């Protein structure tokens, strides 16, 4: 048996052990993606084998929380793919206005950049006051960072261009306070935001929504888990609600391909049919 085959077996055992011990379910994540992340963590933790990593993770919850940062890839940016946000502003917002109150679910919100981007967009369109945003993720460390809303000033300078290209209407600096090399987001942007732990692999729907945003998350799932997540989104959305996905994601070829219709297909914006 080759060493690579041994490693694949060890990874399956580690993923199963994490599920049994900590109830985090990575069993239906993309095999190639999860393997790449675990092998990267292996080098960072100076473990010779995945089995050695498993022993440390099982007996040290702190080590598991460190590993979780590698497994969940907490990387995001504000107004990522500006054309997407411009399409939401121009094509989705006019239709959202027809509802007296709006609920938005941002699934896999990571460290919150997408949440603040959506809140800024909705504020500029006069909808934030009557909107509740549910921001969910499986990584508690990422959720804590999202709640704090503190980002590096270097990042904010990069996000400013995204904001402008996404149709931003104000001075981006109005939305944060600069302090010691960081940007602290205006706390009023999260007045109507509920941050919550939620797993697309194991949890169920918790509210009816008009808009679900889950961008650059499904690409890390296998087909079964993609279908499960799309099922949750379909169940959550009200009649004619909106689903927005990442640039490399689609409902095509899924079990729910006939239950959504494209609204702005190049920007991966769909509507429940």
Curated annotation (Swiss-Prot):
Disruption phenotype: Mutation does not affect chemotaxis and biofilm formation. It comes from the Bacteria. InterPro entries: Bact_Chemotaxis_MeTrfase (IPR050903), CheR_C (IPR022642), CheR_MeTrfase (IPR000780), CheR_N (IPR022641), SAM-dependent_MTases_sf (IPR029063). Residues 1-273 form the CheR-type methyltransferase domain. GO terms for biological process: methylation. One of its GO terms (molecular function) is S-adenosylmethionine-dependent methyltransferase activity. The keyword Cell membrane does not apply. Its EC number is 2.1.1.-. Keywords: Methyltransferase, S-adenosyl-L-methionine, Transferase. This is Putative methyltransferase Cher3. The lineage of its organism: Bacteria, Pseudomonadati, Pseudomonadota, Gammaproteobacteria, Pseudomonadales. The gene is cheR3.
